[in-house]
């Protein structure tokens, strides 16, 4: 359209220029005509035809000019505005020509008499007139052509105006459509923003629900594991009760053989001793209705005798000859027993016969003795069939439902005086607890070489949180000296410690106590139990997802000081290289503060509100710092990432680029990355000198060394070797997925480190430690 308009304008300009040229030519012709007329008037023409011919010629010229002017005026009256000025000029020139004609006529009249000879002949004038007529005809044709061009230009102008109107209408419609599109786009954008906000709120709600469900699932898992451990303890207790019931069954069978003989021998004050070791059955304490019924069945033909109120002693060899002692001697023997005898077979049998530990067999004692023995055998066979491993939480609760029949209230009879029985049970449990606490107090104040068997068991159960090995320890370890002399093979075979990390924990603790006996105090790492490591410490370094693994393997402060990358990857399921480095740097920080929880907490408390001492910053403190530097939209990416102050300060390859990658800042946002680099340079670069001053203040040892420095045992029975330092941690600055080789360190104190860790099917029952996956035993 624009090209057509340009061409039309060029054509109009060309037509106007051609008209101007034709007008110029006409002016030149008129000028030439006037010049010739002047020459004719000056030459004097013929005598008869000169003045008349000149006058007629001038009149004809004037007429032609007038007609031409009139024609031009008629044709140019409706022309365009650009041609009007030319018409006015032509009119002025015509007026001038008329004046010149009048002047020439006057001159001719004055010079008619003397210039006749100079007048041109009529033939020449005719020729000139013909030429002028031809020129006027050409001028007329030119004017007609100009008029046709004007009409054509007018039509083209009309077409152009109509096209411009159509173009304007099209533009207006397009503008209206564009306004509608912009209006709809704004509306859709607002709707999409509202939808995005709603989705974000829904996402936050779902995230909170997800974490709540995870927390509930974790609590349910911990609860199930606790129930599982309790059920295992009850299993062990049931086995002990079954053994005691078997012994009681043999004793009852012995009593049933010679009833008349025992009745004749049961005189007041008479005492018969059989064997060296005896279990006490006091008759003056309340018996269950089933035992009384069985006694009535056995002695229905004999009258009541005062000896029934006395205590009967049955030797462990189950001889047929019973022994009877008085109430006073039995009570004196009970008073003389120490709290350490509570767990003895004598005390357990005494508690069983007094109704303190109800079992599933007591329900069958309501029938005669023979019937009860048959029921006992049937129940044993059923229990052997029902025994199976814990494969899932459903089995745990299924076994819990089966154990509901062990409620002591089901075995009580209306005549059995249940209140004294339960009271005696609570008293026995309280005595056991007091005895255990006394032994734990001895652990604190007595060297290990002076420990007795009970102290060793209390230390293993309470301090080391390993109750699963107490039974084997009670059978094989009778003193602290024996415990100090145990090798790794002895720990595995004698105590059933098949887990390499559990053996390492025991070995480190034993060597720590050995060093304490040599004149040094216990290491500060001994104060960090596995609960603090799994719950508090892992949460501080931002790796709480590994809490359950550390909890299951009972990783305490001493074990932290011995962990290497291989241990983290093989035993604790820490497969990510950066997480391994984060844990090792956290251990390095603990070493710098000499494993002192108080010093670490004091330094963290002082830098909670100001950006100082960043080496002790927790993962949560790093998140707070990221939010403070206006990067809160990326702060949540550091949750459970393992980024803490020790990584930012002690690892030189963890620079601003690695921090930006951990935060999830896109590589294209250079301004944000530069801002992060500047903030890190102002906070973390001066941290090295500050950390040195802090470590000097809190008394950090000058060099890194393990708390275990012995090369072997004093008796030479083990080839244990201990590392005194750590190898380099490796490069982590090039991102978190680098494939650099690991610098594994060997822990040489464990000769059989892989004792069945990968093959659980062939282990003995005491080695299957998955049953004790969650032990809630805290240090005293």
Curated annotation (Swiss-Prot):
One of its GO terms (biological process) is keratinization. The modification Phosphoserine is found at residues 357, 372, 392. It holds the Pfam family SAM_2. Residues 451-516, 529-593, 617-684 form the SAM domain. Residues 416-427 have a biased composition (Polar residues). Residues 79-261 form a coiled coil. The keyword Repeat applies. It comes from the Eukaryota. PROSITE patterns: SAM_DOMAIN. Residues 760-771 have a biased composition (Basic and acidic residues). It is found in: Cell junction; Nucleus; Cytoplasm, Cytoskeleton. GO terms for cellular component: cornified envelope; cytoskeleton; cytosol; desmosome; nuclear speck. Component of the cornified envelope of keratinocytes. May be involved in the interplay between adherens junctions and desmosomes. The function in the nucleus is not known. Belongs to the kazrin family. PANTHER family: KAZRIN, KAZRIN-RELATED. This is Kazrin.
């Amino acid at each position: 359209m624009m090209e057509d308009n340009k061409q039309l304008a060029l054509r109009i300009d060309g037509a106007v220029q051609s008209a101007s040229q034709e007008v110029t030519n006409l002016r030149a012709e008129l000028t030439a005509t006037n010049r010739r007329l002047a020459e004719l008037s000056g030459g004097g023409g013929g005598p008869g035809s000169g003045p008349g011919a000149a006058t007629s010629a001038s009149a004809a010229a004037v007429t032609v000019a007038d007609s031409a002017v009139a024609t031009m005026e008629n044709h140019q009256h409706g022309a365009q505005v650009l041609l009007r000025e030319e018409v006015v000029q032509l009119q002025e020139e015509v007026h001038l020509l008329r004046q010149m004609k009048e002047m020439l006529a006057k001159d001719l009249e004055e010079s008619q008499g003397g210039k006749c000879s100079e007048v041109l002949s009529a033939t020449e004038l005719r020729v000139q007139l013909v030429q002028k007529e031809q020129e006027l005809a050409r001028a007329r044709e030119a004017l007609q052509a100009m008029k046709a061009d004007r009409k054509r230009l007018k039509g083209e102008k009309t077409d152009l105006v109509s096209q411009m109107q159509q173009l304007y209408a099209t533009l207006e419609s397009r503008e209206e459509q564009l306004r509608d599109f912009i209006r709809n786009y704004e509306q859709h954008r607002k709707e999409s923003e509202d939808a995005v906000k709603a989705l974000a709120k829904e996402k936050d709600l779902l995230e909170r629900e997800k974490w709540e469900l995870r927390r509930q699932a974790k609590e349910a898992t911990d609860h199930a594991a606790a129930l599982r451990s309790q059920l295992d303890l009850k299993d062990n207790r049931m086995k002990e009760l079954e053994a005691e019931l078997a012994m009681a069954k043999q004793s009852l069978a012995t009593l049933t053989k010679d009833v008349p003989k025992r009745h004749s021998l049961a005189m007041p004050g008479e005492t018969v001793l059989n064997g060296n070791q005896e279990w006490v059955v006091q008759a003056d304490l309340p018996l269950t209705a089933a035992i009384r019924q069985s006694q009535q069945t056995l002695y229905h033909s004999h009258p009541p005798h005062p000896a029934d109120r006395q205590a009967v002693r049955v030797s462990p060899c189950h001889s047929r000859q019973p022994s009877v002692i008085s109430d006073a001697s039995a009570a004196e023997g009970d008073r003389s027993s120490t709290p350490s005898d509570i767990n003895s077979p004598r005390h357990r049998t005494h508690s069983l016969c007094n109704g303190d530990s109800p079992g599933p067999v007591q329900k069958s004692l309501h029938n005669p003795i023979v019937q009860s023995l048959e029921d006992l055998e049937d129940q044993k066979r059923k229990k052997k069939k029902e025994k199976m491993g814990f494969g899932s939480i459903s089995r745990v609760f299924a076994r819990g439902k089966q154990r509901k029949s062990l409620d002591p209230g089901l075995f009580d009879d209306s005549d059995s005086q249940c209140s004294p029985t339960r009271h005696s049970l609570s008293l026995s449990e309280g005595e056991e607890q007091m005895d255990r606490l006394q032994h734990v107090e001895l652990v604190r104040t007595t060297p290990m070489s002076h420990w007795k068997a009970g102290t060793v068991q209390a230390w293993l159960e309470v301090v080391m949180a390993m109750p699963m090995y107490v039974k084997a320890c009670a059978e094989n370890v009778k003193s602290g000296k024996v415990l100090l002399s145990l090798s790794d093979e002895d720990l595995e075979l004698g105590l059933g410690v098949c887990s390499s990390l559990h053996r390492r924990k025991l070995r480190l603790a034993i060597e720590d106590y050995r060093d304490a006996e040599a004149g040094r105090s216990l290491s500060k790492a001994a104060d960090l139990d596995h609960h603090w490591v799994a719950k508090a410490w892992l949460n501080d370094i931002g790796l709480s997802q590994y809490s359950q693994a550390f909890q299951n393997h009972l990783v305490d402060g001493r074990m932290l000081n011995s962990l290497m990358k291989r241990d983290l990857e093989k035993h604790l399921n820490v497969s990510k290289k950066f997480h391994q480095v984060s844990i090792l740097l956290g251990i390095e920080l603990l070493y710098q503060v000499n494993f002192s929880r108080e010093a670490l907490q004091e330094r963290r408390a002082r830098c909670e509100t100001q950006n100082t001492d960043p080496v002790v910053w927790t993962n949560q403190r790093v998140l707070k710092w990221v939010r403070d530097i206006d990067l809160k939209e990326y702060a949540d990416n550091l949750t459970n990432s393992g980024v803490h102050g020790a990584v930012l300060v002690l690892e030189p390859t963890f620079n601003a680029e690695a921090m930006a990658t951990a935060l999830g800042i896109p590589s294209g946002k250079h301004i944000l990355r530069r801002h992060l680099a500047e903030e890190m340079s102002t906070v973390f670069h001066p941290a090295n000198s500050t950390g040195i001053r802090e470590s000097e203040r809190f008394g950090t040892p000058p060099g890194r060394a393990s708390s275990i420095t012995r090369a072997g045992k004093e008796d030479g029975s083990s080839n244990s070797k201990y590392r005194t330092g750590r190898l380099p941690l490796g490069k982590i600055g090039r991102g978190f997925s680098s494939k650099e080789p690991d610098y594994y360190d060997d822990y040489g104190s464990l000769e059989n480190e892989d004792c069945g860790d990968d093959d659980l099917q062939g282990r003995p029952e005491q080695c299957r430690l998955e049953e004790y996956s969650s032990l809630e035993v805290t240090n005293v």
